[in-house]
Amino acid sequence: MNKEFIKSIVVSSPWEKVEIARHKDRPTGKYYIDNIFKDFIEFHGDRLFGDDKAVIGGIASFEDISVTVIAITKGANTNENIERNFGMPNPEGYRKALRLMKQAEKFNRPVICFIDTPGAFCGVGAEERGQGSAIANNLFELSRLKTPIISIVIGEGGSGGALALTVADKILMLENAVYSILSPEGFASILWKDSKRVKEAANVMKITAQDLNEFGIIDTVIKEPRGGAHKNPQKQVTLIKKELMNAMNEMKNIETNQMINERYDKFRKIGTLE
């Protein structure tokens, strides 16, 4: 990633970025599917329990390339947020996503994921249906999937709920998105027993796209319109399409075994210190 570009990004505090990432008008995963791809056909269900509306997935066309596209999505209003469980998937959502990814592998389609979730749903029903095993199985299967995977964090990337769709060859992240093991509120409550220290927690956690790019956890920071993606959603679509095409071009000539080995090495290196 170009260091001068990173420096040119409008500087906001980590907590300000959290607030922008959570903004009620921020474009959703569904919005990006509708505006970036053509001929989207949605598939439903995990073939085990039901259809989780927090996860949208199907096949589509991107620049005349057939792709599988999956999004963990919030709603654009209160009613949609209730329908989509505020972007918190149940186990059947992760199993649906994996079903579509395995189908993409079978038909040699690249997989493109959009991530916007505060985390996996932690209700009793979700736990009874195997939330932990659903996420763990995704991590395992994505690590060896024989087709390119590109994941884009567009808002909140919360904990294992986000990681379940970000074991990818290329991880892109919007300028004001955040990606972390838990929320700043949760971090402050656990570490300091004081949920009011959220701004301090956000600083300590290194959750911004710029920090994560510097650490090598993500590959590309996608610039946003001044003030955030919600200020000019169509401009944001254009910026995402450009970086998505760049990522796909980088992946198209990589041999399958090399791709899987590089994906494995990418995640094994996370957390190493020089």
Curated annotation (Swiss-Prot):
<keyword id="KW-0547">Nucleotide-binding</keyword>
<comment type="function">
    <text>Component of the acetyl coenzyme A carboxylase (ACC) complex. First, biotin carboxylase catalyzes the carboxylation of biotin on its carrier protein (BCCP) and then the CO(2) group is transferred by the carboxyltransferase to acetyl-CoA to form malonyl-CoA.</text>
</comment>
<protein>
    <recommendedName>
        <fullName>Acetyl-coenzyme A carboxylase carboxyl transferase subunit alpha</fullName>
        <ecNumber>2.1.3.15</ecNumber>
    </recommendedName>
</protein>
<keyword id="KW-0067">ATP-binding</keyword>
<keyword id="KW-0443">Lipid metabolism</keyword>
<comment type="similarity">
    <text>Belongs to the AccA family.</text>
</comment>
<comment type="pathway">
    <text>Lipid metabolism; malonyl-CoA biosynthesis; malonyl-CoA from acetyl-CoA: step 1/1.</text>
</comment>
<keyword id="KW-0275">Fatty acid biosynthesis</keyword>
<dbReference type="InterPro" id="IPR011763">
    <property type="entry name" value="COA_CT_C"/>
</dbReference>
<keyword id="KW-0963">Cytoplasm</keyword>
<dbReference type="GO" id="GO:2001295">
    <property type="term" value="P:malonyl-CoA biosynthetic process"/>
</dbReference>
<dbReference type="InterPro" id="IPR029045">
    <property type="entry name" value="ClpP/crotonase-like_dom_sf"/>
</dbReference>
<dbReference type="GO" id="GO:0005524">
    <property type="term" value="F:ATP binding"/>
</dbReference>
<keyword id="KW-0444">Lipid biosynthesis</keyword>
<comment type="subunit">
    <text>Acetyl-CoA carboxylase is a heterohexamer composed of biotin carboxyl carrier protein (AccB), biotin carboxylase (AccC) and two subunits each of ACCase subunit alpha (AccA) and ACCase subunit beta (AccD).</text>
</comment>
<dbReference type="Pfam" id="PF03255">
    <property type="entry name" value="ACCA"/>
</dbReference>
<feature type="domain" description="CoA carboxyltransferase C-terminal">
    <location>
        <begin position="2"/>
        <end position="250"/>
    </location>
</feature>
<dbReference type="GO" id="GO:0006633">
    <property type="term" value="P:fatty acid biosynthetic process"/>
</dbReference>
<dbReference type="InterPro" id="IPR001095">
    <property type="entry name" value="Acetyl_CoA_COase_a_su"/>
</dbReference>
<keyword id="KW-0276">Fatty acid metabolism</keyword>
<dbReference type="GO" id="GO:0009317">
    <property type="term" value="C:acetyl-CoA carboxylase complex"/>
</dbReference>
<dbReference type="GO" id="GO:0003989">
    <property type="term" value="F:acetyl-CoA carboxylase activity"/>
</dbReference>
<dbReference type="GO" id="GO:0016743">
    <property type="term" value="F:carboxyl- or carbamoyltransferase activity"/>
</dbReference>
<keyword id="KW-0808">Transferase</keyword>
